[in-house]
Design a protein with these regions (language model features):
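Short Gly/Ser/Thr- and Asp/Glu-enriched loop/turn motifs at secondary-structure junctions
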Residues: 55-62, 99-104
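Catalytic "initiation/cleavage/transfer" segments centered on a nucleophilic residue
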Residues: 70, 89-131
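Short, conserved acidic/polar surface loops in the N-terminal third of protein domains
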Residues: 37-38, 64, 118-119
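Conserved hydrophobic/aromatic beta-strand scaffold that supports enzyme active sites
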Residues: 24-26, 65, 104-106
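Conserved short secondary-structure elements within globular domains
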Residues: 78-92
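Signature for HUH/AEP ssDNA processing cores
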Residues: 1-60, 68-76, 81, 130-137
Length: 137
């Protein structure tokens, strides 16, 4: 299985090796009774935009990738604030394992995965592409 870490670039997949935060956060919601209903609620969420949304590899949950503006907050604290907001808006609890910035996630095999339309097939720029002559690590 292929996996990725949505929250940043790392020298090694541990928090202290974080080189650059991606300004993305992966929220994992498990044991969902009605996946399509929750998917629509997340896509229409009042406070958070959706970059990517797909059925988790287990088949009974969703992985929701949202953009974040950390504004000096640590990933862990921002994650907790987002999880509390989601809970306050009546949505299911978020798996707190995502509060670990180094947490990886299996890539989706969901033919119905939502990809934000702002992304095109021919990507012109990528935040993960280092500047000329700059080592990303």
């Amino acid at each position: 299985f292929d996996y990725c870490n949505f929250s940043g670039l790392f020298g090694k997949r541990i928090e202290k090796e974080l080189k650059m935060h991606s300004v993305l956060m992966c929220l994992d919601i498990d044991h969902v009774e009605d996946i399509m209903e929750l998917k629509q609620k997340l896509l229409n969420h009042e406070y958070f935009d959706t970059e990517l949304l797909f059925v988790s590899p287990s088949g009974n949950g969703l992985k929701w990738i949202i953009p974040v503006d950390l504004k000096g907050w640590e990933h862990f604290r921002y994650f907790k604030a987002v999880a509390n907001c989601i809970k306050a808006t009546g949505l299911p609890l978020v798996d707190m394992s995502g509060s670990d910035v180094a947490r990886s996630c299996f890539l989706p095999h969901d033919p119905q995965a939502y990809i934000n339309p702002k992304y095109k097939d021919d990507v012109e720029e990528n935040i993960f592409r280092p500047r000329l002559g700059e080592c990303p690590f």
